[in-house]
Amino acid sequence: MRIAVIADTHDRLPPRVLAAIRSADEIWHLGDVCNEAIESALLATRIPLRIVRGNCDSNPGWPLTLDFTLEGFRIHLIHIPPTVAPPDTDLLFHGHTHVPRHEIMVPARFHNPGCITRPNRGAPASFAWLELIKGEAPKWTLEYV
């Protein structure tokens, strides 16, 4: 399964990013969507979409966290990164910092795709691809935009 992971779009989703993620099996947005037109554009792809609410979002229909199992991995989506992963989490995905992250903090791996529109600390604008195959190590790849 190939997942496009984006975060912190802050009212903007560049057309080249939208075109790139059309090959995904799922899209995960890790918060700070800021404009429901972004959600509409993502839904228009007809690719399954998971969104969590960020600190700049006001849509009460978006959950603060999502927990689910996919391809045998226990996954936690959240906007603001916790210090420690919740129990029974293999992979934790967050936004908020606008800086890419790929870090093992036993027992979980923490991932941040960076920010498409307003990256911080000299990081280039980015989103990420996650490839999950049951029984194999997850593959995390940043794509710079």
Outline where the language-model segments fall.
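N-terminal active-site segment of His-dependent metallophosphoesterases
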Residues: 1-49, 57-64, 123-126
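Active-site neighborhood of phospho(di)ester-bond hydrolases with catalytic His/Asp-centered motifs
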Residues: 5-7, 26-32, 50-55, 76-79, ...
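Short, glycine/serine-rich, charged loops/turns that create anion-binding
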Residues: 10, 34, 56, 98, ...
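Short, flexible, glycine/charge-rich loop motifs used to bind or transfer phosphoryl groups or to couple energy/partner
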Residues: 15-20, 38-40, 65-66, 79-85, ...
